[in-house]
């Protein structure tokens, strides 16, 4: 068994790096920046150009808003809660980008909670956290249930809800005792297959 501390150190310092000259010197900002980089992988498709425009060259409009919302949240963090906040703040942003930013941020915060578990514990309702939808998840889900899916960067809210429902169906079938949120599917699918 590999030493757990080594794995934890890798996850928390390399995978979720604190950026150079960050606007905010805390782990929340590091998690949001990492999630943003994940979203921007999809920017090459040209389908999330409004999001890309508002968050390029250090503008970070959406990231900054998400940061403040999480810091000032009066309720437990969940996908629906944060997605709704971002949609209300800027209705022009592509839903695909919003869901990925929110869900990847929550995923990284869950990892930080588990691995660092110190003063920076975030109050997350994991049962209400959705799986971040991207090409990897859609490919694995398609292999499981045979359903074709459009490119994640083209997804609107109703496509997203359909995908989350498919994930929930799978989790209930495979893990009937589980009370996990859909984000668990993301962690399950990253195991080597």
How should each PLM-predicted stretch be described?
Residues 1-28, 86, 90-193:
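C-terminal accessory module of base-excision DNA glycosylases/AP lyases that mediates lesion recognition
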């Amino acid at each position: 068994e590999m030493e757990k501390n080594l794995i934890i150190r890798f996850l928390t310092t390399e995978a979720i790096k604190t950026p150079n000259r960050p606007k905010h010197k805390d782990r929340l900002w590091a998690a949001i920046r990492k999630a943003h980089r994940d979203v921007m992988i999809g920017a090459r498709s040209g389908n999330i150009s409004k999001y890309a425009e508002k968050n390029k060259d250090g503008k970070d409009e959406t990231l900054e808003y998400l940061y403040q919302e999480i810091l000032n949240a009066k309720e437990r963090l969940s996908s629906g809660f944060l997605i709704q906040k971002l949609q209300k703040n800027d209705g022009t942003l592509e839903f695909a980008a919003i869901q990925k930013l929110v869900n990847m941020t929550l995923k990284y915060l869950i990892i930080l909670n588990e691995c660092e578990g110190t003063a920076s514990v975030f109050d997350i309702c994991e049962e209400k956290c959705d799986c971040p939808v991207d090409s990897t998840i859609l490919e694995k889900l398609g292999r499981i249930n045979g359903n074709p899916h459009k490119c994640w960067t083209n997804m609107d809210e109703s496509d997203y809800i359909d995908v989350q429902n498919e994930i929930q169906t799978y989790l209930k079938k495979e893990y009937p005792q589980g009370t996990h949120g859909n984000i668990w599917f993301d962690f399950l699918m990253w195991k080597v297959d």
